[in-house]
Swiss-Prot record:
Subunit structure: Homodimer; disulfide-linked. Forms a heteromeric complex with the signaling receptors for transforming growth factor-beta: TGFBR1 and/or TGFBR2. Interacts with TGFB1. It is able to bind TGFB1 and TGFB2 with high affinity, but not TGFB3. Interacts with GDF2, forming a heterotetramer with a 2:2 stoichiometry. Interacts with ACVRL1. Can form a heteromeric complex with GDF2 and ACVRL1. Interacts with BMP10. Interacts with DYNLT4. Interacts with ARRB2.
Region (Disordered): 624-653
Organism of origin: Mus musculus (Mouse)
Further comment: Lacks a RGD motif, contrary to the human protein.
Known tissue expression: Detected on blood vessels (at protein level). Detected on adult pulmonary artery, capillaries supporting the heart muscle and lung alveolar capillary endothelial cells. Endoglin is restricted to endothelial cells in all tissues except bone marrow and is also found in stromal cells within the connective tissue of intestine, stomach, heart, skeletal muscle, uterus, ovary, oviduct, testis and thymus.
Domain of life: Eukaryota
Region (Essential for interaction with GDF2): 270-282
Lineage: Eukaryota, Metazoa, Chordata, Craniata, Vertebrata
TM spans (from-to): 582-606
Keyword NAD: no
Disulfide feature: C31-C209, C54-C184, C244-C330, C350-C382, C363-C442, C394-C412, C493-C549
Principal location: membrane
ZP domain boundaries: 363-510
Protein name: Endoglin
Region (OR1, N-terminal part): 27-47
Amino acid sequence: MDRGVLPLPITLLFVIYSFVPTTGLAERVGCDLQPVDPTRGEVTFTTSQVSEGCVAQAANAVREVHVLFLDFPGMLSHLELTLQASKQNGTETQEVFLVLVSNKNVFVKFQAPEIPLHLAYDSSLVIFQGQPRVNITVLPSLTSRKQILDWAATKGAITSIAALDDPQSIVLQLGQDPKAPFLCLPEAHKDMGATLEWQPRAQTPVQSCRLEGVSGHKEAYILRILPGSEAGPRTVTVMMELSCTSGDAILILHGPPYVSWFIDINHSMQILTTGEYSVKIFPGSKVKGVELPDTPQGLIAEARKLNASIVTSFVELPLVSNVSLRASSCGGVFQTTPAPVVTTPPKDTCSPVLLMSLIQPKCGNQVMTLALNKKHVQTLQCTITGLTFWDSSCQAEDTDDHLVLSSAYSSCGMKVTAHVVSNEVIISFPSGSPPLRKKVQCIDMDSLSFQLGLYLSPHFLQASNTIELGQQAFVQVSVSPLTSEVTVQLDSCHLDLGPEGDMVELIQSRTAKGSCVTLLSPSPEGDPRFSFLLRVYMVPTPTAGTLSCNLALRPSTLSQEVYKTVSMRLNIVSPDLSGKGLVLPSVLGITFGAFLIGALLTAALWYIYSHTRGPSKREPVVAVAAPASSESSSTNHSIGSTQSTPCSTSSMA
């Protein structure tokens, strides 16, 4: 019975025993590898190996600092950047400072759900699709990587550094690696482990050849994984997808000794691997691998032993995490890459989606304004002949760096409701190309008023501008007038205790920061609310602070958000402890008084005892001195405590 037509479960578990090829056969297999037509097959992979990088753990750090150096060959590239939070052992991801350094223009599709984040980048090179809901820091003009790393180190302990060549997508896993060293020193060809995985944009070269003297149509797919910089146990996931439903095929996987395989295939195949492997439909069953030659010709010779007539796909890759092999057909059709044909690339490769993402209107002072960066338009290779509102007589003004389109609310076809202003923007191109149209809306901030109120009870009855240390505070952001056109959310809040104090984070990325900050239900009118408990242990104790909240506002008919910051000045007072407890001077005074009274009483009792008992022989008195440093040590510890966080557990006494 032909093995190639065995039922899938049987053939997936079929183990090929090791065959040791002779040297002559390995050198003379009669199979000249040639590049394959890209339309005949595709190989994609993700890897954690970067051209240069490092991973470190920042002990006791409140902020992670990650630095990505992006090197692109073309004038414009696209990148998908995803940040994933780690919640090992139930701990939340701490604050993150991410530095993006790019050598060319890049459009970034960014995802970072519910992660407190600061981004530092050069806005003239890095363009985000949609405004990221994070804190932005302008990257200073620095000329070398060392200068950038020195600057990044001032923001906190560096957790990871990675240099990537032409990435298409990056997944950065946040959190501390307990096995990493405490210092991040970049190394060439570094394996970033679970911290970072990325997919290169460059097409993976695939080779193929026909084995001389072998008849039939049995195909071989060979994947060779090259060793990485670090030898550690690793499982490589291989997804093999063939479009045909019948045929005889062989899959040969070769890798370093520490690599095992998890195989996901949709076709009956013979499997030959180094290292143990398991298949998706039987994940619990592991099959031992065999010893295979460590050369391309040796692996081809193994395919020949299994009666393969064609090596349909031969691929060599660096140490990868996942690899996907797709073949458009099978059954013995062999086709190498055709001779290149000289073609003239189209002059206009403008992306309408990316161009329209640059249209971001702003409203204020009864005027809608949008500015289109001319450099970004040129980077997109777009040629614009006109930028107007719905009323074509309202045209953009051409400045040195921007095309600026603006209009009062009363003209150019503006549609104005109580709090939202809308219009249509039309972008015209040279003759022959249809214009692009985009409906734009923005919130009229002048029509809304915002007030930040502090209350001392959960009933929110009487506002106050004074907070007592150790007392729970209740905060409400009031928006007037009431409207259903705009929804308001608390994006972030913090309490600034001044230049000599701390910045106390209360809310980050719409999530309570700490166990003593609580997001409350909105008011009956829909106003956002939260509460916090502040205990400050600083010398001297701060007497004032500034409470600031960043609000995210969104029109009910639009997904794009705008932001508004509201602040209020707070007075901070120490609690009146007359009926609640004793402060440190009182405690010391009472202690000294009690000691003095006790000493006098002891002396009096000893005097009475010594003069009233009989003249019997007295025993010697032995005095044991208490350590003199105990009291001063306690005092020093209380003075040295400096901390300000919501619901801090530090102590002053």
